Amino acid sequence: MVKDINEVLREAKSILKANEIDEREARLLLAFSLETTIEKLFIKKDITGIEYNKYIKIIKKRAEGMPYAYITGHKEFMKLDFIVNKNVLIPREDTEILVEETIKLNKKKILDMCTGSGCIAISLAKYIDNAEVEGVDISKRALTIAKLNAKQNNVVVNFINSNLFEEVTSTYDVIVSNPPYIRKKDMENLQKEVTREPEKALDGGEDGLYFYKKIIKEAKKYLNE
């Protein structure tokens, strides 16, 4: 059964609006669902019943709190494309500031602690000439994604599966990190979308500073003079 595309979009927008989600995502998710571009959607008049069912299923997932990036499987960070799924924290725009400030230092040997998707490590490897970058994470599943992202962005990053510095043997010019930072008592009050992200990547202990303190305490042994 063929459905008018504008009616379908109105239905999707209504579902999203009822769940306090930006209505503009309706068109973006339709393009994703149909594997086409936003531009081509404007000349498309209708969709099939199969296409409609697939699309509405996606819209309902979004309405239930599934992050947009987990639905599409991608997130832009530092003008690079990163693969993301439920095993990694979704890269945040705020974290680009950390990358930009590190690039200014122009250091060549860099460690990214708690690398997750690898977005920080990979961005540094991409934008600093001849940089030697390593990324550490306790999650093997996260590192699987990080390795895919390094390959996709044509950079070489050495990823290490380690609980903080336990398996780290090198020294570095600079150590960067965006570790878990949310206070334990605040974990229960997170936005619906954020609760879909890995708890290990969010829970920063009682005061939210557990990992910061551990990293700062141990980092001096791994920094070049």
Where are these regions (language model features)?
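Non-catalytic accessory regions of SAM-dependent methyltransferases
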Residues: 1-34, 39-46
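Conserved AdoMet
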Residues: 31-104
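Soluble or luminal CAZymes and related metallo-dependent hydrolases
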Residues: 4, 8, 51, 138, ...
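Conserved SAM/SAH cofactor-binding pocket of Class I
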Residues: 96-188, 193
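Short glycine/threonine-rich catalytic loop with a Thr-x-Gly-x-Asp
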Residues: 91, 116, 208
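Conserved hydrophobic residues forming the short capping helix/wall of the S-adenosyl-L-methionine
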Residues: 16, 150, 219
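Glycine-rich S-adenosyl-L-methionine
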Residues: 140, 191-223
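A general structural signal for well-ordered alpha-helical segments in protein cores
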Residues: 9, 26-27, 55, 68, ...
